[in-house]
Amino acid sequence: MSSAKPVLDPAFQGVGQKPGTEIWRIQDFKPVPLPKADYGKFYNGDSYIVLQTTCSKGGGAYLFDIHFWIGKDSSQDEAGTAAIKTVELDTMLGGRAVQHRELQGYESDKFLSYFKPCIIPLEGGFASGFKTPEEDKFETRLYICKGKRAIRVKEVPFARSSLNHDDVFILDTEKKIYQFNGANSNIQERAKALEAIQHLKETYHNGVCDVAIVDDGKLQAESDSGEFWVLFGGFAPIGKKAICDDDVVLETTAPKLYSINNGQLKLEDTVLTKSILENNKCFLVDCGSDLFIWVGRLTQVEERKAASAAVEEFIATQNRPKTTRVTRVIQGYENHTFKSKFESWPVNSAGSAGAEEGRGKVAALLKQQGVDIKGASKSSAPVDEEVPPLLEGDGKLEVYCVNGSAKTALPKEELGKFYSGDCYIVLYTYHSGDKREEFYLTYWIGKDSIPEDQEMAFQTANSIWNSLKGRPILGRIYQGKEPPQFIALFQPMVILKGGISSGYQKFVEEKGLKDETYSGDGIALFRISGTSIHNNKVLQVDAVSSNLSPTDCFVLQSGNSMFTWIGNASSYEQQQWAAKVAEFLKPGVAVKHCKEGTESSAFWFALGGKQNYTSRNATHDVVREPHLYTFSLRNGKLEVTEIFNFSQDDLLTEDMMVLDTHGEVFVWMGQCVDAKEKQKAFEIGQKYAEHAAAFESLSPDVPLYKVVEGNEPCFFRTYFSWDNTRSVIHGNSFQKKLSLLFGMRSESGSKSSGDGGPTQRASALAALSSAFNPSSQKNKGNDRPKSSDGGPTQRASAMAALTSAFNPSAKPKSPPQRAGQGSQRAAAVAALSNVLTAEGSSQSPRIGDADTAELTPSAASPLSEGASEFSADKDAPGDGALSEGGRTEPDVSVEQTANENGGETTFSYDRLISKSTNPVRGIDYKRRETYLSDSEFQTVFGITKEEFYQQPGWKQELQKRKHDLF
């Protein structure tokens, strides 16, 4: 008896077993794995399948996205093969991937986020033959760039008629790359186009060519502008933008639901609810600009293929534009975009009964076909608790209790006591690693507090925030949802029953309620459940023995007597904390310690007698991936758009954005956002929390923060690969990007920023570095001609630029700067600025630390008179320059350290940790892990370096902190 032959393609055997990207090209109607060296290269005559595997933050099963990309010259048969093979790949992965159709030039933001900064499809294909850039003679090309974050680069005819006033264009010539900014073009699109220029420069010019900016409508007598127009046959007016069919984007419409049966679509006249989606059927949700195919878990593979084909036919017969997005989701694994099309989405876990049933059937099907599904899922192994980033210690803590229109400062001995009937304002002033004064400002809302006190707490906190010029991060925290950074400020934090404000007392009296406010001479029971500095919150509970639990420790107050009760299953940390809490509540009183089972009669008497009790099941918040969104308000309804694979570069200074970590929600505000809009941050944040509560099980009482660009705290930065030097460069998005990538300044930038400050100095240092290090610009192997080093002329230009930076009153017009080595110049800028702005420092910056040196921010604005009560202590601890971790470091370079170690380029883990007793000197302290050998790296992190750097930046940072490599 012969076994059944697998119908699934063997090219997909064993895929999806680790995070990262895998790509196949369709060749002779079969998927062929693409070499990793060719990732990001797409030929317009081919079709591709792209699998993106990600590891969820909470562990458990991997998450999969499958994209099939269709080149504009790809044949219909190849495109159809890609669609069918995508379904097979999904089946191989257990049938839970989200599938996306991608047309060349109209790719989704998520797809483009895998290939930053952009993709520029190449001519040719497998059938017609490939043309590589190396084989081609250099040809001048004109590109149009669109997109504020995910940039779409499209080649257009090299002619003046292609230009317009509304878009951004890149003209790539053999010796120079020009960016033409249409007069009406978007500032953020101009900034993203610079990233495309950097990509062209590195890919086709070996990193060595000049870059020039040409502004539409500005006819200065500049050589760059003149050269640009000469290439088009001389200057002449350009026409208005012509709208073509490919630019048509349908508006998002009210969703329509179609059932799909035997390849036929039927419009369902019903309200769109989750309950009508049957697990043995496929459905189409038509939203105009977006189409979603929903697939029930119990459908067969052939049914899924037929549904995809039916939707393709639907698009053709409806004559939908190419910009129409098509996404296929599986029951139980619907993405946020799909769920948001419904009025609400009752939350069930992805591993619901229906999902598990379907997954089991798919697994059985694969086994029958002899397919190895070893890599289809990842077991849910327990995850070690990770201590989140906490605020620097030794700061100044001020706490105020709201009492009507007044606020009362708590004395030092009362700090940490919170009554559930009251509201509080907390201001913590501290100094970060670079000695900068920072503020953590929050207002805490007790669960039994009255609305008037809640409103007064918000108004007072907002007034303080305004008086401090928006520098603090401002948070709203509800009782029971305290974030770790808040809890860690108080050692201990104890939540007491009742309230002491006049408003609460009046409310209790008017309602005839029993006043349960904590009294120092009464009977009270406190539960200690936390085990670490960031979660050791203590809660007063009803003083009855049924509230005891073997997994916790308790403190019992009975008049002047104090008991600690130690559960048999409690931890050593809880036991220590119980003794500390008892001393905090009753300083100097002798504490009677009793273990579970050894209680005295006095103990039981205080609790009203002995009763049965059981172990309390501790609840843990679901760990979710962080998400970054842009948003808009339409008719009062919040609409959000996700930024995929986000980074610090996505925080654009003209925007307000929402970062949802599931543990807290941040509303981030760029410096260029209007002041009136900034005042709406909490309103926006609350609307988002309500929106996410309906679809993603987010609590509407989640901690809510607003933070202004340049004042991001450590627990916000940890979700990004953060570079402090970026936050001190002033200007709009375009000006910042121009300075960061090329050390250049735009004409508009000079007008808006006075003498230029850091931007001008960046330009000066870039020119100086380029002039005196011409060897750094050597050819990397490309045979194309490159511009000369410049010699004395370039050095003269560099000295002129440097002189201008140090003498802002003298502003000679500098010649265009060379545009090489963006990252190298950024490092040089940081080193130079450190020299220029460091105050009270007794040492000079080390060459080995140039790429990690931080720029000193501008001085803090003085507080207003009305905020004097909340003013922070200005005395910064310590003196002298400190490296990361607060240690004074000797002036030693990496090279010298390597020589002392016999030429080693790697170091042992014990020497690289931040608390090492024998630290390595002169390394990049922000990238300690890079100095580990490959074998020791895998021993420490449990994964290879390649796998580590494929993870999101925030996840890398958390793991580095866990292993003391930060």
Swiss-Prot record:
Phenotype seen when the gene is deleted: Malformed organs, including twisted roots and shoots at the seedling stage, mainly caused by asymmetrical expansion of cells on the opposite sides of an organ. Increased dynamic actin cytoskeleton network. Hypersensitive gravitropic response, faster recycling of PIN2, and altered auxin distribution.
* Tissue and organ expression note: Mostly expressed in growing tissues.
Q: Which UniProt keywords apply?
A: Actin capping, Actin-binding, Auxin signaling pathway, Calcium, Cytoplasm, Cytoskeleton, Repeat
Kindly list the places in or outside the cell where this protein is found, as annotated in its UniProt entry: Cytoplasm, Cytoskeleton
Signal peptide residues are: none
Q: Where is the HP domain?
A: 901-966
* GO molecular function list: actin filament binding
Task: Kindly give the SUPFAM superfamilies that the UniProt entry links to this protein.
Answer: Actin depolymerizing proteins, VHP, Villin headpiece domain
| Family annotation (PANTHER family) | VILLIN, VILLIN-2
- Into which family does the record put it? Belongs to the villin/gelsolin family.
| Descriptive protein name | Villin-2
Originating organism: Oryza sativa subsp. japonica (Rice)
